Design a protein with these regions (language model features):
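C-terminal accessory extensions/subdomains outside the catalytic/core fold
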Residues: 2-150
Length: 150
């Protein structure tokens, strides 16, 4: 996996620490900084809070170095606000982004399988086998979890 793709994942909220060891030099420094920074999801949650939504304190104060995980309390807040057209549109845009990332991953896995088969990947991973484990790892799990509420 490229450093640029890792930066994108870190910016969205998918933060696997083990991958920091795969990069050195300027790439490693940039990734370490991005890993320690707030995410797009954190910004989204912060906007909700500033607009008066009762976002749980532990969600607002989460360790930004950790991957965003599902939170039932936050899901209830999101569902409650979904009747607001602008808010719902923003949620749908984030879901579109997340879906696009997952679709890109699938296409990437298939390209890798076609190109190198089961050989080791260029980033030091197990190649296509590793990539396949990332296919259904959403950046915004709460936006997927609430789908059953509609």
């Amino acid at each position: 996996q490229s450093a640029q793709f890792r930066e994108l994942e870190y910016a969205l909220g998918i933060k696997d620490r083990i991958e920091l060891d795969w990069f050195s030099g300027i790439e490693g420094e940039r990734l370490t900084q991005r890993h320690a920074s707030a995410t797009l999801w954190d910004a989204f949650v912060g906007v909700m809070h500033r607009q008066g939504a009762p976002v749980p304190a532990h969600v607002l104060n989460r360790d930004v170095r950790e991957t965003v995980i599902e939170n039932a309390e936050l899901q209830a807040v999101i569902i409650d606000r979904y009747s607001d057209e602008g808010f719902a549109g923003l949620c749908e845009t984030l879901t579109d982004l997340d879906e696009g990332l997952q679709e890109w991953r699938y296409r990437h896995v298939m390209m890798v399988r076609r190109t190198i088969g089961t050989k080791m990947g260029t980033g030091g991973s197990d190649g296509a086998a590793y990539l396949a484990t990332t296919l259904f790892r959403p950046a915004f799990p709460d936006l997927w979890a609430i789908r059953t509420a509609f």
